Amino acid sequence: MDSNTVSSFQVDCFLWHVRKRFADQEMGDAPFLDRIRRDQKSLKGRSITLGIDIEAATRAGKLIIERILDEESDEALKMNIASVPASRYVTDMTPEEMSRDWFMLMPKQKFAGPLCIRMDQAILDKNIVLKANFSVAFDRLETLILLRAFTSEGAIVGEISQLPSLPGHTSEDVKNAIGILIGGLEWNDNTVRVSETLQRFAWGSSNENGRPPFAPKQERKMAGTVESEV
């Protein structure tokens, strides 16, 4: 096993522990708490994949961080902070919409890279909107927290989320997953639109009809046999 993979996991475990202690003192905001919950699932998945105990990794990560801090000068710290692009949190969904449980009558699931796509294929002839909470850097989607598909009545009928065991994804991963979800929902004569906010940050533009500018290859894929995709 690559030593960098192990040490990266150890550092991530300790940093999560620090953030959790901070949150336990009720000092974290909503995006901060969302990241803690998301990263906890990711660390559990990586622990299983790597075969490394999280508690032992956390202790090892603490030693690595302490060594780095002992060697770090204040000036170097200032320069590193200045070089990191500032990201912000964009919310289409309310906390209630993000945390609400939902159920599928005819569940379908697809894994597209590090993202999991779920949808209810029992939904017919509905107007559906895709809304998401995500982080943005340089005015482009950086990390998807959660995407959900809502009918005009407010029911949840689809979802895109990260796989805990495969952390990290690109904006292209997100756009491909959205295309698969739209194709699956439209297969049953539903009308699907993407929120203007999500269009703007994922594609850099927005259409009034809610249809993002998918590439021709993606359009052909969406028009194909959905059952093989979802």
From Swiss-Prot:
**Species name:** Influenza A virus (strain A/Gull/Massachusetts/26/1980 H13N6)
The region called PABPN1-binding is annotated at 223-230
Quote the record's domain comment.
Answer: The dsRNA-binding region is required for suppression of RNA silencing.
PTM annotation: Upon interferon induction, ISGylated via host HERC5; this results in the impairment of NS1 interaction with RNA targets due to its inability to form homodimers and to interact with host EIF2AK2/PKR.
Q: What does this protein's UniProt record list under function? A: Inhibits post-transcriptional processing of cellular pre-mRNA, by binding and inhibiting two cellular proteins that are required for the 3'-end processing of cellular pre-mRNAs: the 30 kDa cleavage and polyadenylation specificity factor/CPSF4 and the poly(A)-binding protein 2/PABPN1. In turn, unprocessed 3' end pre-mRNAs accumulate in the host nucleus and are no longer exported to the cytoplasm. Cellular protein synthesis is thereby shut off very early after virus infection.
Short sequence motif Nuclear export signal: positions: 137-146
Give the location of motif Nuclear localization signal in residue numbers.
34-38
Subunit architecture? Homodimer. Interacts with host TRIM25 (via coiled coil); this interaction specifically inhibits TRIM25 multimerization and TRIM25-mediated RIGI CARD ubiquitination. Interacts with human EIF2AK2/PKR, CPSF4, IVNS1ABP and PABPN1.
What is a biological process (GO) this protein takes part in?
A: symbiont-mediated suppression of host mRNA processing
Q: Which family does it belong to?
A: Belongs to the influenza A viruses NS1 family.
Q: This chain belongs to which protein, by name? A: Non-structural protein 1
Q: What is its main location?
A: host cell
Xref: InterPro entries? NS1, NS1A, NS1A_effect_dom-like_sf, uS15_NS1_RNA-bd_sf
Question: Which parts of this chain are annotated as the region CPSF4-binding?
Answer: 180-215
Question: Which Pfam families does the record associate with it?
Answer: Flu_NS1
